[in-house]
Amino acid sequence: MRHLIFTGFVLTLTALEAVNVAKSTDNDIVLKVSTEKHSSRDSHHFSGEWLESPWGDLYQFRAGDQNWLTAREHCLSLNADLAAIRNVEQLDWILSHYAPLSSRFAQRLVQIGLYAPEGQTHEWKWLNGNEINKTLLWSSGEPYDHSMEGRERCGLLNVEKRVLDDVDCESTSPDHHAQRYICQRTSENHKQQQRSNNYIWQKIENLFSFFGIGGSPTPHNATIPNDYEDEVLKNETSATVKSTVKFSDSEEETSSEEEESVSKTLAALPKIEGSGESTALKELQEPEGSGQIVEKKAIETTGDLVSGVDEEKLDKMINKMEEMIKSIDDLTVPPAVLERTTVSTVVLKKEEIVKQEKTDEKKVEDKKETLANELNDNKISESIEGDFDQAQSKDMPKADIEPPKEEDCDEEGSGSGSGEEDEKDESSEKIELAPEKEDKIKEFLGVLRLFLDRAEHGDLRKLLDDQSGKTLLERMKNAVREANRREFEMLEKLENSKKSEEEKEELAKKDQMSTEEQKDLYKKISSAVMKAAKIHKIEEADKVQDEQAMEKFNIAKVKADSEEAESEGTVEVLKSAKEGKAEIKEKVGNDDYYGDYLDDNNVIKIQNREKKDAKEESSSDDKKSTDEKKKEIKKIEKTNKVNHDEPKKEEKKNEEQVKETKLESSTTVAKKEDVTTVASTTEEPKSDKDSEGSGSDIEESTVSSAKPAEAEENEAELEASGHEEVSTTTESTTVAVKEVPVDEIEKIAKLEAKQHTEDEKVTVETKQETAVTPAPTTSEKTSTTAAPSTKPAEETTTTTEAPSTTTKPVTVAVKKVSPEEMEKLVKKESTEKVTLLPPLPTFTFPTLAPFTFPTLPTLATTKPSPAPKVPTLEEILGNLNDQFKKLLSPPKPLPK
């Protein structure tokens, strides 16, 4: 029960000082209560509690719109200074109060107690005089004074980078954001500040001194045996005086006047017997948070204790204490803000005062009688001292006494107002929260908003099912971090997918050919196609030419087989056929009709050329149809003419044989002198050549026969149709003639006379038939007559026409050739002549018997065999172009 008495006693004194009830007669008593509440401070200023560090110093973390000098002045007003950081451990402890740290946050700077003394620009020190530890780093390029007047002499701490920076001491934030700063106070200064500013702790000390717990003895009136219960009864009688409160308009009183008024009020109060001197009520300063526990003082010695305790009296005291506690709870409701309160007492009537005094005296007398049997004051003090002994009170329940908070200190002593005004104030009163609570509420709402924005469907269920013992705020923060992590993972996946797509696109671009490469490839392919087409065309032309040449070769072979020996005429025919083939090859090879397909605008040219070719084909088809009809008509006419001319030709042959017999008789005389035989075959289409003569008077006679009218018509038609002529030429052969003695000539003549009963002239006629080809050819028949005569005028040539053959005039030149010239000509021919057939056997005319070629039967004209249909070059190129376009066209995009 003793601890309950002590607790009630402390609460009673606290309530009395808070209410400040005074008793006065006539004068008004004025009591000024501090109105500088935390809510009335600057809206940009945030304060905190004093936090004790592991090394004993106390720190307060603040924020406001101020520069470095203003921050230091504020710390000095609190009996502190800006924080100094001595090592990395202190830095870590300070930065732990600015968690969380992240490079994603905006830059946070803290004003600390670092400065450069006047005149020293490179030696920075802390405000307590210590030098900077080398383990603390500066930001890059700092410290460096960027101002022209040397104003950057104060230090800052970068929270995120953990480095130091310099700043102008008088500069503030341009965007008026809250500037952070830290105040540092030693433990000794903190205790001193708490004693001077916290009046509650001063009253507690007075309370301890009242009970004799203190260093200096307090005067004690031992003659009056009144205990604490009597004093309480006296206070109750004085508290029954009704009091009213009125507001005063005077706001110009100084602190000295207020102290005088307070001292008068306290003097008017009834003094407690046995207590120490009353302490004056000071003007309340700005609350400084929680204080330190005051040291326990020695207990003063008192008189002897009285044995025995009245339990009924203790029960009454406990009941009264409970009632007082209830009244104190009613008074702790925060009243409206009042700058000044005036307490006035109303003087009661004298009768009532007299009655009260009588009742008081009776009570006092009764108590004096009962107190003789109660404990002595010394025993009571010893019992109280035992209560404070920790060893004795170890097992007893304890009541913790906590100092009031800043809000309670500011609001205490405000008093109560009058009836009507109190009701208005209570209706208009609003609950004000401490800045720490506001920050927590804001933080909670911000985290809740982030959680609702970023959380998924299952996050709320996880949050409710979480039984880890963490607070709701921490669980929501963890959920937000998890959502952020998911978003970062999704962003990384998207970035990786984009990178992979870009790489695929780059590879596709690299694989695709550029337009220039496509053009080059198209040119190469088209050139290869053109070459292949030309080779194909040449091969087709070679096949046709080979067929024509084989026909000519077969005809010549048949003639050679029918004869006993080969003649120069057959060789020339075969040679002319081969030369005609070579000329056709050259013409076909030089055809560069499709050379312009390699241009850039090849597609347009191909289309235009196809249109022209279609027109030409239509016109050529019409011409071919008309040409074929004309050819059929001409063939019919030729067959009719041949049948009509055959009897005439036979008559002419008979006449020619008669003439030849006459000529042979005249040649026998000439053989005795000279024997010359020259056979020359030359092809001259429309002109006569002069014969060559070296030292001889032999003349050459030429007989030209014009082409038939039918051949001229055929040539004109073929030229109009645009076909090329394929002409065959025969080279002339010269035979050297030797001078033979007369005796040998006679012998030869005798031998010939024996062999031939009838002298005949040796004639050699070569017939050349025209083969039916796409281009018109001129068939020539060369005849060589060996006419040894004494006179050049007697030289003659005979021509015979066979059906479907044409003969050309052949000039025979007779001259004397020396053996040396003949040898030279033979060597020259051997070097220049190209052998198209196996080498022919050499022979000499004198050793051969004269012979005549039999008349060859007329051969039917062979119809041209239709060549197989070959695709044109335009068709081949068109198909190839279509295929190349498909190959060179860009690939279709893949379906996404």
UniProtKB/Swiss-Prot annotation:
Source organism superkingdom: Eukaryota
Source organism: Caenorhabditis elegans
GO-annotated cellular components: extracellular region
4Fe-4S listed as a keyword: no
Chief location of this protein within or outside the cell: secreted
Name of this chain's protein: C-type lectin domain-containing protein 180
Signal sequence extent: 1-18
Species lineage: Eukaryota, Metazoa, Ecdysozoa, Nematoda, Chromadorea
Subcellular location: Secreted
Domain C-type lectin stretches: 54-178
The keyword Disulfide bond appears for this protein: yes
Start-end of Acidic residues biased regions: 250-260, 407-426
This protein's UniProt keywords: Disulfide bond, Glycoprotein, Lectin, Secreted, Signal
PANTHER family on file: C-TYPE LECTIN DOMAIN-CONTAINING PROTEIN 180 (PTHR45710:SF38)
GO molecular function: carbohydrate binding
SUPFAM superfamilies listed in its UniProt record: C-type lectin-like
